[in-house]
A protein has these predicted regions:
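Surface-exposed, low-hydrophobicity segments enriched in Gly/Pro/acidic/Ser residues
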Residues: 1-476
Length: 476
C-alpha cells in the first residue's frame, strides 16, 4: 500500500452514481447522519432490486420496465394523485409506500397497463409524460456486487456511474417500527403473462431519467455530496487524513471561513460541516480529525467520501454558519448553484468555487494491471468487460500488445470491486513462423553448342515461439 496526497475542488462531486431512494430519505438525511455512529433512523431496508438501461445486450434478468417518478411519494409531483393530508406530522402519512398516493393503484387496476404494447398509451391517458413523469426502457437487473446501499439512511451507490441518457429504477422493501412497506415491484412477483406468453411490465421507482431536469423532484434524489478520491483500489483508515479549506482571495487556503455568526466563530470548516464530531474512540468529542465511519462518511471499497449534509456548501452551511448574518455578506461564501444547477453550469461560477478538500490517503494499486500471459497479441483483438459492460480502449483501459499487458485506467472501475474479464486472440494458436527463401542460378556458355549451369535454393523457417504445434516443426 502506498500513501499519497490529494487535493480536490468540491464542485467536482460524483454525478449519476449516488441516489436517495425517495423524498422521505432526502428530508431526513441530515438528521439521520447528525449523531454518528448512532443512526437517528428507525428504517431498515430488507430487500432491493436495482435496474438500469440494458446497454450490454444481457438476456438473463432483463425485461421491459417503467420507472415512475411519483410512485411511493406521499407528496407526489402531480397533485391529483395525492391521497394523504398535506403537512401532516403523523409519520404514517410521510412514509414512502406504493399506497402513499393513487398512482400505483390506478395503473394496476388497468388490465392493459402491464402489456408492453399498450403501456405507453395507458400512461399517456393518465396524463403522464415520458422523460418527465416516467421512463420506459428495456433494463437489466444489477447483481448485488454491482452496488451498495445503506439500509438505514436510504441511499444507493452504483459501482459504475450511469451515462447521461441511461435510466435507473429500483424496488425496495423496508420495515419501520416492525411494519413492512414496499415501493416498486420485485421481478419475482411479476412473471410472464401466461395467456399471451410475453413478459409483463415491471413498475419501479424512478431515480434517474434520460434527461436532467432541475425543476423535477428526482433532481433532488441525485446526491451531490459524494466525492471520489481518484484512488486505485480501496481506502484504508490507517493514516487517512482529510480537511476542508476555503480559498480566500489574495490570502490562500484557510481552514476557517473569513466571516461567520458569533455562535460558531473560530470553528474550522471540518467541524462546521459535521465531519469532525468524534474522537478516535468514536466518543462525541471533536479531535480535529475527519470522522472515518464506514458506510456513512466513507465508502472504502469505492474510494468515496460522503458528507453528512446534503448541501454542505449551500443551504446547510448557511443555516449553520450564517445565522443573523446579512444575506449580502453570506452570499459571498455560499455556493447554492452547486445544488440548483446541473454540474457543468454550476462550475461556471468561478467566484463561488472556493471550497477545497485535501489530505492524504493510503490505498493499493493492486489489480491495475492484468497480464495476458502471451506476447505480441494481435492489435485490436483484446476485449475487456466489467460487470458485463464492454469497456472502451483508451478510455477505460490501455493495452501493451507486445508484452501482453492490459492496464485499467478508469479509477471508477478499479474502485468498483466488480470482476473484470479480458478475452483476446493468442498468436500461439496460429503457429506463426518467420520464413526465409533464397535462390541462386549461375550459367556458363562454353561455346555456341555447349553451356552448363548451377542452381541453389534454401528455404528456412524459424518459429516466433520456442514451442510449436505438432506437425508444424520448422524446416531448413
Amino acid at each position: 500500500a502506498s500513501t499519497q496526497r490529494f487535493q480536490k475542488r468540491l464542485d467536482d462531486y460524483e454525478e449519476n452514481r449516488h441516489f436517495l431512494l425517495s423524498q422521505y430519505f432526502r428530508d431526513n438525511f441530515n438528521k439521520s447522519m447528525s449523531n454518528l455512529p448512532v443512526i437517528n433512523s428507525q428504517f431498515q431496508i430488507k430487500r432491493m432490486e436495482v435496474w438500469v438501461t440494458n446497454r450490454n445486450g444481457q438476456t438473463t434478468n432483463a425485461r421491459d420496465v417503467v420507472g415512475l417518478m411519483d410512485i411511493g411519494e406521499p407528496a407526489p409531483h402531480k397533485a391529483s394523485y395525492r391521497t394523504r393530508p398535506s403537512g401532516s406530522t403523523n409519520i404514517n402519512d410521510q412514509l414512502p409506500d406504493n399506497s402513499a398516493n393513487s398512482l400505483y393503484s390506478k395503473l394496476i387496476s388497468n388490465g392493459t397497463s402491464r402489456n408492453p404494447a399498450s403501456v405507453s398509451s395507458v400512461l399517456t391517458m393518465e396524463g403522464l409524460r415520458s422523460a418527465e413523469d416516467y421512463e420506459r426502457t428495456f433494463a437489466r437487473k444489477l447483481t448485488e456486487n454491482e452496488y451498495f446501499f445503506n439500509p438505514q439512511i436510504g441511499f444507493l451507490s452504483l459501482n459504475i456511474p450511469l451515462q447521461p441518457d441511461e435510466v435507473l429504477g429500483v424496488a425496495f422493501q423496508y420495515t419501520y417500527n416492525g411494519k413492512v412497506f414496499q415501493v416498486g415491484e420485485f421481478s419475482e412477483n411479476i412473471a410472464l403473462d401466461q395467456n399471451k406468453g410475453v413478459q409483463q411490465i415491471l413498475f419501479l421507482k424512478l431515480l434517474k431519467a434520460t434527461t436532467q431536469r432541475t425543476d423535477l423532484p428526482i433532481w433532488d434524489l441525485m446526491m451531490k455530496n459524494v466525492y471520489s478520491l481518484d484512488l486505485f483500489g480501496q481506502l484504508q483508515q490507517q493514516d487517512f487524513q482529510l480537511n476542508i479549506l476555503y480559498e480566500e482571495p489574495s490570502a490562500g487556503l484557510k481552514r476557517y471561513l473569513p466571516v461567520t455568526s458569533k455562535a460558531v466563530e473560530g470553528k474550522s470548516l471540518i467541524k462546521l460541516l459535521n465531519l469532525d464530531r468524534l474522537n478516535n474512540r468514536n466518543d462525541p468529542q471533536p479531535d480535529g480529525v475527519f470522522d472515518y465511519v464506514e458506510g456513512y462518511t466513507v465508502l472504502s471499497k469505492m474510494g468515496r467520501v460522503v458528507f453528512p449534509l446534503l448541501e454542505p456548501f449551500g443551504d446547510d452551511l448557511k443555516n449553520i454558519a450564517f445565522k443573523d448574518i446579512d444575506s449580502n455578506v453570506s452570499k459571498k461564501y455560499l455556493y447554492p448553484q452547486l445544488y440548483r444547477n446541473i454540474k457543468s453550469e454550476a462550475q461556471t461560477y468561478a467566484n463561488l468555487n472556493r471550497f477545497v478538500m485535501e489530505g492524504q490517503v493510503k490505498g493499493s494499486n493492486g489489480g491495475a494491471e492484468i497480464s495476458l500471459n502471451a506476447f505480441n497479441v494481435p492489435p485490436g483483438s483484446v476485449s475487456v468487460r466489467a460487470g458485463g459492460q464492454i469497456l472502451k480502449e483508451g478510455l477505460d483501459y490501455m493495452v501493451d500488445y507486445g508484452s501482453g499487458t492490459v492496464r485499467i485506467i478508469n479509477p471508477g472501475i478499479l474502485s468498483s470491486n466488480i470482476p473484470v474479464n479480458v478475452s483476446f486472440e493468442n498468436n500461439i494458436g496460429f503457429g506463426f513462423q518467420e520464413r526465409g527463401f533464397r535462390a541462386l542460378r549461375l550459367d556458363y556458355m562454353a561455346s555456341k553448342n555447349f553451356n552448363f549451369g548451377f542452381s541453389s535454393t534454401r528455404l528456412s523457417e524459424r518459429p516466433f515461439f520456442t514451442k510449436t504445434n505438432f506437425g508444424s516443426d520448422p524446416i531448413k
